[in-house]
Amino acid sequence: SPHPNLPIVATACSDRSVRVYSLSSFNLLSNITGGHKRSIRSVAWKPDSGTSALGESVLATGSFDASAGIWRRWEGNSGKVNQSEDNEVDFTKDGGDDEDDEWRFAVVLDGHESEIKSLAFSPTSPLLATCSRDKSVWIWEELEDDNFETVAVLQEHEGDVKCVCWHPSEELLASSSYDDNIRLWREDIDDWGCCAVLSGHGGTVWWVEFEGATHTALKAQTEQQQRLLDLREAAGPRLVSCSDDLSIRVWRRIPKDRPNGAPQTGPKMPSIIKTNTIEEEWVPETALPQQHERAIYSVSWSKITGRIVSAGSDGKIVVYEERWAADQSTTQIETTDGTKEIARTEWVAVAEFGDAHDVFEINHVVWAKRRDAGRRSDDEEIIISTGDDGEVRVWTLENFS
């Protein structure tokens, strides 16, 4: 998990530790131990960690011991990040070699009955989501003085819940499961409930991730292209998922353009009629080109370029890019102003790394800003991958701008 503000990355390890590496020098900076009794499965940074206003990094860890841990570390005095001119983070200024001085194990969150598979902090509220092999999703609210309160236990999945992720600008949570489905959750008055079920995958859905809220990879040059971009702006960020069925799918929301979720013009999927319903309609937009031969465990959607990277059991890392359809084809949609034509896009595989971790499976891939001396621009990105070989590898796309 790359830090949201500092040039560091945290990795979860089977030896019950979390290792923090510099993205400037690629050196090991910290080895965080002592919080869990079994292997650590997942890590996640609090989105405002290390900002000048807060001055504190907060890291959550999910473990095979069925607990989640919250770790805290102050990044220097007066709320300022302790960094040198080359963006290297000094983790030893105040703490020496004493790991307990660096990272404080603030609180343990118990409640799940078996291993925690994934966890994620909300970027819009003081909430943390965790999911588990016990088929449940828990939502925790952070209070003062290292206290967390359980605000929801969601148990509608019929299999292990593999992943949770938050919408970048709304209090909307996505979860994916061994039951082949994706569920979206919202708060309805005082209770959290399922607002959409995304079905279509033919196997375990290993990972889900929302599109960034700000990237502008596509530029409109025609009226039809601008209509598509306007439609996407109204719908908000899309969702990408990957599965045992060898597919990567992109899902989009049908925006509610009338108050209280009234039906839109044109065909619409049937839904249960409620007063003040939280239900949303999400539809499959496209499937990316099939490049993998075995289960796809991880996808990551770049918040800068809009590219998607995938990896999995076959040891491949594949990068995809969305472009305007080469044949300039359009499709028709129904709007309040009648039928309109909008442009189409297509996804193209632009890079592939085979045997990226030799003969081993790849567990996770993620985009991060490039911070080392070789970076060519402030927006250049790297891909970080972890595999069953116990290694963390870093990749660049030298041939692509």
Question: How would you label these PLM feature ranges?
Answer:
Residues 1-6, 43-56, 113, 118-126, ...:
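Loop/turn segments within WD40 beta-propeller blades
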Residues 12-15, 61-66, 73, 124, ...:
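Conserved strand-to-loop turn within each blade of WD40 beta-propeller repeats
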Residues 18-21, 68-73, 137-141, 164, ...:
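WD40-repeat beta-propellers
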Residues 72-97, 141-146, 186-190, 252-278, ...:
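Short loop/turn segments immediately following beta-strands, especially the blade-tip
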